[in-house]
């Protein structure tokens, strides 16, 4: 998911997506440990998506505090 797409979502929606991605990451790591994972690049992709979402949430927090 691109940053532009993430910015169009509300903060609550982003937090829901982060939760879903964390669950997916857990499952991917489990599959990796058991030797069932075919696409190992997906782990990296999910981690980066989570980081992007957290960054955008933090940017919004900083912007909100700056307005006060």
Curated annotation (Swiss-Prot):
One of its GO terms (cellular component) is cytosolic large ribosomal subunit. It holds the Pfam family Ribosomal_L29. InterPro entries: Ribosomal_protein_uL29, Ribosomal_uL29, Ribosomal_uL29_CS, Ribosomal_uL29_sf. CDD domains: Ribosomal_L29_HIP. It comes from the Bacteria. Belongs to the universal ribosomal protein uL29 family. This is Large ribosomal subunit protein uL29. It comes from Geobacillus sp. (strain WCH70). The lineage of its organism: Bacteria, Bacillati, Bacillota, Bacilli, Bacillales. The gene is rpmC.
């Amino acid at each position: 998911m691109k940053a532009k797409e993430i910015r169009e979502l509300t903060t609550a929606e982003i937090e829901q997506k982060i939760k879903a991605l964390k669950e997916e990451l857990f499952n991917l790591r489990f599959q990796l440990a058991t030797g069932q994972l075919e696409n190992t690049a997906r782990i990296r992709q999910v981690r980066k998506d989570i980081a992007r979402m957290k960054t955008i949430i933090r940017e919004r927090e900083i912007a909100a505090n700056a307005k006060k």
